[in-house]
């Protein structure tokens, strides 16, 4: 079985009857959602908030009841993937382009469980390009200010056209030559740039990490 599938399906066991949950986006969260769809079919009663249009479509296909985050005060649990995770449970997310909604849903949850395969575990964040969601207006000005923090930037494309997020924004992917020694500081500096909507740095948000390894499940 695929390591992502092992981690994703295991994470679904943390969802209990009556919970309001956040559904992540990406290839690992896909397996959690599939497993939850199976459990709903077997009688599990939950309500879910999707973190992307892609996840919303999958949940509807599996008959998982969906709600709006506007209609609840908080969620019991969110299960989502990550592009990188370190030993302090700091993350880079946004490889799939859903980082803003993922962060809103995660920050509205009492608990955030991150599911990854062992290839995503790193000693220091930053080998994977850091996604930054920006507004389209004057985007080159915003990109220039991001570059002034010492990174190489690339405007994200899809099918040779500018990638547009579910929120009608753009994404700049950033590589920092010396990785990211202090993610919380970098996040704050990026958020101070006018035009930056959100960063893919998730700091002090993760409750638990479930890692699919060749030797089975590992929890951090």
Curated annotation (Swiss-Prot):
Record's catalysed reaction(s): aldehydo-D-ribose 5-phosphate = D-ribulose 5-phosphate
Residues binding substrate, per UniProt: 25-28, 80-83, 93-96, 120
GO molecular function annotation: ribose-5-phosphate isomerase activity
Enzyme class (EC, first level): isomerase
Tree of life domain: Bacteria
Active site, UniProt feature: 102
EC number(s) from the headed UniProt entry: 5.3.1.6
InterPro entries: NagB/RpiA_transferase-like, Ribose-5P_isomerase, Ribose5P_isomerase_typA_subgr, Ribose5P_isomerase_type_A
An individual GO BP term: pentose-phosphate shunt, non-oxidative branch
Keyword Zinc: no
Pathway, per record: Carbohydrate degradation; pentose phosphate pathway; D-ribose 5-phosphate from D-ribulose 5-phosphate (non-oxidative stage): step 1/1
Keywords: Isomerase
Family assignment from sequence similarity: Belongs to the ribose 5-phosphate isomerase family.
PANTHER family assigned: RIBOSE-5-PHOSPHATE ISOMERASE 3, CHLOROPLASTIC-RELATED (PTHR43748:SF3)
Annotated function: Catalyzes the reversible conversion of ribose-5-phosphate to ribulose 5-phosphate.
Subunit structure: Homodimer.
Name of this chain's protein: Ribose-5-phosphate isomerase A
Organism: Bacillus anthracis
């Amino acid at each position: 079985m695929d390591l992502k599938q092992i981690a994703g399906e295991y994470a679904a066991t943390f969802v209990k009857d009556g919970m309001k949950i956040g559904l992540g986006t990406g290839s690992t969260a896909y397996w959690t959602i599939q497993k939850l769809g199976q459990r709903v079919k077997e009688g599990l009663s939950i309500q879910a908030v999707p973190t992307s249009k892609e996840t919303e479509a999958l949940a509807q296909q599996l008959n998982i009841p969906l709600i709006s985050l506007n209609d609840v005060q908080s969620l019991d649990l969110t299960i989502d993937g990550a592009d990188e995770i370190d030993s302090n449970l700091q993350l880079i997310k946004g490889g799939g382009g859903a980082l803003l909604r993922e962060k809103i849903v995660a920050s509205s949850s009492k608990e955030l469980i991150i599911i990854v395969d062992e290839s995503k575990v790193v000693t220091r964040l930053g080998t994977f390009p850091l996604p930054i969601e920006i507004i389209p207006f004057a985007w080159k000005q915003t990109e220039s200010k991001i570059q002034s923090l010492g990174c190489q930037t690339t405007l994200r494309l899809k099918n040779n056209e500018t990638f547009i997020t579910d929120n009608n924004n753009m994404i700049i992917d950033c590589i920092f030559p010396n990785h990211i020694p202090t993610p919380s500081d970098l996040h704050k500096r990026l958020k101070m740039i006018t035009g930056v909507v959100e960063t893919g740095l998730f700091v002090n948000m993760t409750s638990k990490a479930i890692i699919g390894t060749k030797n089975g499940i590992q929890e951090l």
